[in-house]
Amino acid sequence: MTSCQFSSVEASGSGTVKTLMSDLPKDPRYQFTYRVAEFLNDALYDRYQHDDGTLFRRLMSYHETLSESEEISFVPFCGNHVEILNVDIPEPCVVNYGEEFMNESFYEIDGEKAVAAEAIQIFESFLDLFPLEIADGRGFIESDFRYMKDRRIPVIMGSEYKELFETGDIFEGYYLFERVSFEVIGIAKSGNTFYHPAVGPALYDRYIIMPFERVTNDSPFSRLQLLQETCGFIISENGWETAVSQIQQSLTDSGLADWRDQIVVNTRTIR
């Protein structure tokens, strides 16, 4: 399964900072926006990871079918953390910040100091729904979303990182169990808000913002990444039933009918 979850939280925050629903941008689409998450059981997940590539191709077909729907708009999102190596990051950016088990986010990987850092993975459509202003550097461009093996992953750093990183800086870490290099292309302005399915409204400030890179060739990494992309948001002006129907029909049409009860649409909108 992916790390995507639902939460009934209406507000979230750390320290004295509290982010409320009212801090989200004023977008009428929010009243039609539902959260989507993947809950593959162990048997289906194991089959997906270890088959001959048939399920990977079917899942690609599902995404293509869903993107062509005229009834809904699907906005992929996931919140997998990044394991940063040999860098002391700001405390608010650490996974489990403010919790009694925050110390579990610090460890070693093959003898190197590592820390679990908050991160999100998105497409352009997410930034259309939850805009992000850039203080320094640039935002994402189309080529940032193309998967290129062994290239540095372009990232935008939340404003908490502004004293630590500059545009052009490179750092090492692990993402989806692979060691990768990250290149800072921008630093975000402070105070921009988005909706995190697992925690509710949140500030971009403490997150590493990563592009979902569009995968086409089957590989262990591609399978994990494509599965992450089943999570996110559905905008359905015709209501929850239409959102569910579109997902289930797309799964059936793509040969994934046995996943129909594993991709879940929350009954509540985010607004």
What are these regions (language model features)?
Residues 111-208:
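Hydrophobic secondary-structure segments that place a key small or acidic residue at a functional site
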Residues 24, 58-71, 123-130, 157, ...:
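Hydrophobic, Leu/Ile/Phe/Ala-enriched alpha-helical segments that form helix-helix packing faces
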Residues 37-40, 157-160, 237:
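Structural motif
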Residues 85-108, 203-222, 265:
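Charged, glycine/proline-rich intrinsically disordered loops and linkers
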Residues 1-5:
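N-terminal signal-anchor/signal peptide hydrophobic helix marking the start
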Residues 174-264:
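Small-residue transmembrane helix packing/gating motifs
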Residues 9-123:
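Membrane-proximal extracellular/periplasmic loop immediately following the first transmembrane helix
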